[in-house]
Structure formats: C-alpha cells, structure tokens
C-alpha cells in the first residue's frame, strides 16, 4: 500500500469477459503479457484504450477543458512493430536458454516467442535462428545476481519501406 492506494495481484480468472470473443493468435498467450488484449476485437480494444486515455487526461488536467479528437486505429492489427527487444533468460529457474518476452508479472522468467504476432515474420525467423545458434553452442545468458553469463538482449529493427533489418545482440 502506498499513499492512499493499494496494489494487488491476479491469482485466477474464473470467467472470461463477454468482450473476449476471439481465440488467441499466439501460442504463449496468456502467460506472456506482450499482447494481453488479443482475445478482444480490435474495435473493443480501441474503445477500452480510449477510456483509459481519457481517464488519465481527466485526472491530470483536473477539470481543464480540452478538445478530444478520439483514438485512431492502425490499419494493421498484427505484425505492426518495426522494433523489438527480446530478452535472453530461462522459462524457469536453471532451465534451458530461452529468447523472447518476459512472463507476465515476472522480471526473470522469459518465454520463447517464436510466433510473436507483434513483429514481422522476418523478425521471428531471426529470433528462432539466434536462439538455436546460442542454444547449440551452450552460451549462457547474463545472470544479474551472480554476474555470470553473456547474453542479455536481442534488439531487432526492420525498415518498413526498405525491408532492411538491424540485428543487435547484447
């Protein structure tokens, strides 16, 4: 509890929201928190995000008038990110090397995201190749607490118009 507010943790979902009408498009959903609204229609996602932004603005502006121009959806619902940073780690303590996104609610556990729907297919192919390369060579990820290992992140950037790809292993 901090300054008049409390924080909690979700233990279990007993019933899906009526807004969750779609099947997940990702194999690691809902463990990964990268695209937690994917079971909602894109239209409902935009409505929900509009409410969230308006609540933040109303609170920050303390009743000051402003002109709301609305939320404008992207023409591309999936594979829209042109930059992504994936983490090296393990899915569980002392497990095999993984490369992907952090497990929802965890700063340590990493889930391999080889079918991530946020990035272009080229980037998921590179992620898979880099993961396999270091897995075969038994290269370990950097463990912050022990100050051992090497691999920290894989940064990928793709030029939308050129298709050029930057691969940066950290």
Regions found by a protein language model. Name each.
Residues 1-170:
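Accessory RNA-recognition modules of RNA-modification enzymes
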């Amino acid at each position: 509890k901090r300054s008049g507010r409390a924080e909690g943790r979700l233990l279990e979902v007993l019933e899906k929201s009526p807004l969750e009408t779609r099947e997940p498009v990702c194999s690691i959903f809902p463990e990964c928190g990268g695209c937690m609204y994917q079971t909602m229609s894109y239209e409902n996602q935009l409505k929900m995000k509009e409410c969230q932004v308006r609540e933040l603005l109303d609170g920050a502006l303390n009743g000051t008038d402003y002109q709301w121009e609305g939320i404008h959806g992207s023409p591309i619902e999936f594979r829209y990110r042109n930059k992504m940073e994936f983490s090296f780690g393990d899915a569980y303590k002392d497990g095999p090397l993984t490369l992907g996104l952090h497990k929802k609610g965890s700063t340590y556990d990493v889930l391999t995201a080889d079918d991530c729907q946020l990035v272009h297919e080229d980037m998921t192919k590179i992620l898979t190749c880099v993961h396999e390369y270091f897995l075969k060579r038994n290269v370990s990820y950097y463990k912050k607490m022990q100050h051992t290992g090497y691999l920290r992140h894989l940064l990928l950037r793709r030029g939308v118009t050129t298709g050029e790809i930057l691969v940066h292993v950290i």
